[in-house]
Amino acid sequence: MRAARLHGVRDLRVEELPDPAPAPGELLVRIDACGVCPTDVRKYLLGATAGYPLNPGHEWVGHVEALGGGVEGWEIGQRLYGDTYAGYAELAALPVEPGPWSHGPLLLPEDLPLERAIFVEPFADCLHAVIDQARIEPGQRLVVVGGGQMGLQLVLAGVLEGAEVELVEPHDERRGLGLELGAGEAVSDLSDVWGKADAVILSIGDGALVERCVELAAPGARVVLFAGFGDAPRAELDLNRLHYDEISVVGSEWIGAPPNQRRVHYGVALDALVSGRAALERLVTARCGLDGLEDAFADVQAFRGLKTMLVP
């Protein structure tokens, strides 16, 4: 099979590898598509803690080709979602039991469009940020800063939770998408936001924006740091403001969510995608093969387009 694997910082190689054989407790899956995630690009640029070689794709859809020994409840030909680091390849061996880096396979209906199906994991991630970390309640005001592919999913997650959502995003087209997804307002700069918010989610890895997000927070509000900050993870904050107004600054990282939360949010995300309440395929702006993955990473770095779907 062909696969794209990282061998070090900025060292991505498309390789011919032996087809994997499913071990006991595993499924052999032929991968139909995989979403390109900004975290994959961070691993490419800054290094991977999981070791090398690494196939960082983790938003993938495929069909079962073979069953390993002892596997029950799965059949050849079934369609599934996988979130292990294996998605940038033609084939993957997927454990059926959840592990530290995987929720386990999730059965998908055949009629769910491929461009929508790849969003199960990232949309669940956004639900975790909105529900568990921002703790937004119906009718509360949520400001999402940054309208990239994840920021727009955060907008929709907030809308589905009943929040009054405002998007801050400089690009006209992305602001328009935010309004289409249900944001009540979309402005181009933080200075255009009036009043205070019950929660602010920062979806841009720019430490200079953290203090400005805190300034927007109402007493008792939560500021959620959704993006990673790369090699510049520093910010200055008015600690008296945090103290006297009881403002919480929290992170949101899907891998850090407890397994029970992840199970719940996977189910909610899949239900929203299947029902059409989360018609996120409009965020897919490019497609590529394995040989085009490095160009797709460059597009993410340059903020070109939104979501790229890799078809191996």
Task: Describe each model-derived feature in a short phrase.
Residues 18-35, 45-87, 109:
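Glycine-rich beta-strand-centered segment in the early N-terminal region that forms part
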Residues 82-145:
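NAD(P)H dinucleotide-binding glycine-rich loop of Rossmann-like/cofactor-binding domains
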Residues 134-136, 176, 181-248:
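Glycine-rich cofactor phosphate-binding loops and adjacent beta1-alpha1 units
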Residues 151-152:
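N-terminal Rossmann-fold NAD(P) dinucleotide-binding loop
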Residues 160-164, 219:
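Conserved S-adenosyl-L-methionine
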Residues 169:
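Conserved acidic E/D residue at the C-terminus of a beta-strand in Rossmann-like folds
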Residues 233-284:
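C-terminal substrate-binding/catalytic core of Rossmann-like NAD(P)-dependent dehydrogenases/reductases
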Residues 263-312:
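C-terminal hydrophobic helical "lid"/dimerization subdomain
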